[in-house]
Amino acid sequence: MGSITEEQERGLIDAVEVGAGLAGWHGGMADSFRESINYQFMVGGQWVAHPGNIIEYEVNVVDHEDPVTAGLEDFRMRSEQYYMHVDPSNKVLATTTFSGEHVPWIEGNVIPVVWKRKWGKGRVFYSSLGHVAKDFEVPGARTLVERGMLWASK
């Protein structure tokens, strides 16, 4: 979506490595700098597609013990369901399963929706939810981002 200079990239990555938190959602974080592999490694993933554009889908909370997800149950969204390339070292907190209705070869694929990770001494939180502000009227989506940002800031 955008570009980042080597100097800017190094500054951001260095800041997180020494303890700064980084949190974000949707394409603003996972499709910011397609040409920056180092940024993608730090974030833990890269957007690929949203088959069907705005559709109904389910978000499945997979870790009910984590402070970011404690007390949350699965919930429905009507938004872009992100298909992503994701780092297997992420601590996945929520996933979604693709129906295959819009792209048959991804039927049954489970893709992380929300994750967190350490990057050096820093913390990184990401949620693919949040294409438009209205998406955060869904309590589960809003709570995940609120708690995730707080976790990353510690």
Model segments located where?
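Extracellular ligand-binding/catalytic regions of CAZymes and related secreted enzymes
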Residues: G100-I111, K118-K154
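Active-site-proximal beta-strand/loop segments in catalytic clefts of secreted hydrolases
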Residues: M1, W25-M29, T95-F98, S127-H131
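Glycine-rich, charge-decorated loop segments at or immediately adjacent to ligand/cofactor-binding or catalytic sites
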Residues: A30-M42
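Stable alpha-helical elements in mature extracytoplasmic
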Residues: Q8-G11, E35, H64, A141-V145
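Catalytic beta-strand/loop cores that center a nucleophilic Ser/Cys/Thr
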Residues: G45-G120
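Short alpha-beta junction capping motif
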Residues: M1-F33, K121
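Short amphipathic alpha-helical segments and helix-helix/interface helices
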Residues: E9-I13, Y83, M149
